[in-house]
């Protein structure tokens, strides 16, 4: 089974750190941020990893190589300057991801989401489900949330009455979900997901453990403290 780590972002809110270093390679407790994902994916049984990149992508390839240092095999999906957004990046990488459900992880989060359980979920994804998402409590920078999670584990696009949760950036997808996106085109993920939700094709679960969106310098410092204690 394959997993994809999204690593094509410019990291504007991290400047000037990201002017010379791509965000996935920023140090978090002695290890590049993306390295935490690679280690945990390997432990969970994901050994075929696809990584997309745009900004300073050559540095990512030079640092991670073929993945052997982490015990995995890495294939890269380069994108043009500016990137293709999340859905566009996944669509471009489909030839590397194969025909089975795959896991996608945002490269700029620090989390202890159970990737072993994710492996099992991907292996047994019901035929009528095209995506399975991990949702978390809303952080201060996203107080209203993104989607709502119903008692039957279905995920809905409407957020009403304070029932919203935040998408963690970790999800399992069927490749067919991206068939309508032409390779090389720019496309956001949220509209694709909302379309699938309206057809009752998205399930999810709430994660209550460690999750941090490492999107600012302040949160990078928080990640360094968390990861230092975590390891």
UniProtKB/Swiss-Prot annotation:
Its EC number is 2.7.7.99. It holds the Pfam family NTP_transferase. One of its GO terms (biological process) is peptidoglycan turnover. It catalyses: N-acetyl-alpha-D-muramate 1-phosphate + UDP + H(+) = UDP-N-acetyl-alpha-D-muramate + phosphate. GO terms for molecular function: metal ion binding; nucleotidyltransferase activity. CDD domains: NTP_transferase_like_1. UTP binds at residues 11-13, 23. Mg(2+) binds at residues 108, 213. Gene3D superfamilies: Spore Coat Polysaccharide Biosynthesis Protein SpsA, Chain A. Keywords: Carbohydrate metabolism, Cell shape, Cell wall biogenesis/degradation, Magnesium, Metal-binding, Nucleotidyltransferase, Peptidoglycan synthesis, Transferase. Its cofactor is Mg(2+). The keyword RNA-binding does not apply. Pathway: Cell wall biogenesis; peptidoglycan recycling. Substrate binds at residues 106, 146, 213. Belongs to the nucleotidyltransferase MurU family. NCBIfam families: NAMPUrTaseMurU (NF045761). PANTHER family: N-ACETYLMURAMATE ALPHA-1-PHOSPHATE URIDYLYLTRANSFERASE, NUCLEOTIDYL TRANSFERASE. Monomer. Catalyzes the formation of UDP-N-acetylmuramate (UDP-MurNAc), a crucial precursor of the bacterial peptidoglycan cell wall, from UTP and MurNAc-alpha-1P. Is likely involved in peptidoglycan recycling as part of a cell wall recycling pathway that bypasses de novo biosynthesis of the peptidoglycan precursor UDP-MurNAc. Is able to complement the fosfomycin sensitivity phenotype of a P.putida mutant lacking murU. This is N-acetylmuramate alpha-1-phosphate uridylyltransferase. It comes from Neisseria meningitidis serogroup B (strain ATCC BAA-335 / MC58). The gene is murU.
